[in-house]
Amino acid sequence: MEQADTIIQIPHFYGSLKGMQDKFDKYARQDAFTGSTREEWEAWKETSRETLKDLLGWKYMETCDLAPRVEEVVELENGIRREKVILQVEPEVYMPMYILIPPKQSEEKQKCFLALPGHQGAGKFSVAGRNDIPAVKRMIEFYHYDYGMQLAKRGYVAICPDCRGFGERRDEALQKGTDEKSFLTSTCFHLAHMAEPLGETVAGMCTWDASRLIDYVYERGEWDTDDLGVVGFSGGGMQTLWISALDDLSLIHI
């Protein structure tokens, strides 16, 4: 219902998107691959990756020991073991995750997927299939958000992290106890406002964390890394897109 008595009608708007589109048309695609040999492709790929990392703010990210810590192990009814592990992705910056490990069907190493979360699902809780939490169950039913659990049911190890600002990584603005909206949503908006003046981006931070997660898979050494996969929905899909461009260690991207 319009409330015309409380506002005025704007006859013409002076938005910014047209100017941004013009700028995109002027400057975009200048670094497209134009070679014809494998050697030229490899050289272009490495140069492009460094450019992307610079745009994402990776030069400000700090490496450190992962220092993995197992906080919980739960045996689920379907035979899947759910581990809760905390990783240190930067000095004093921590990433909680669930690892869903199905029963082994052979002596071969199990194949593994990173299952990255998007918005409105409480981070890892939906992806890992926490139907015991009513609000999460509702999001799973609405968005089909439990793709980590679905992978585990099909025999894949599924690593389901909280990306920055989601789940247990929410910052102060949404640390509101039992408030459902705060629980389901994220503080990535607040992170973005802090990151931009530093030359960082939320996409860069999340992609960095995904790369540290890949480091953990290799360091742990229990699973097949020849076909390491990454899957994501919404913001998780964005992370999957970026990580597919930035490294060769993950080969399957959904």
Give the role of each language-model region.
Residues 242-249:
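Alpha-helix C-terminal capping segments
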Residues 75-133:
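Glycine-rich active-site/cofactor-binding loop and its immediate structural neighborhood
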Residues 252-254:
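Conserved small/polar residues in nucleotide/adenosyl-binding loops
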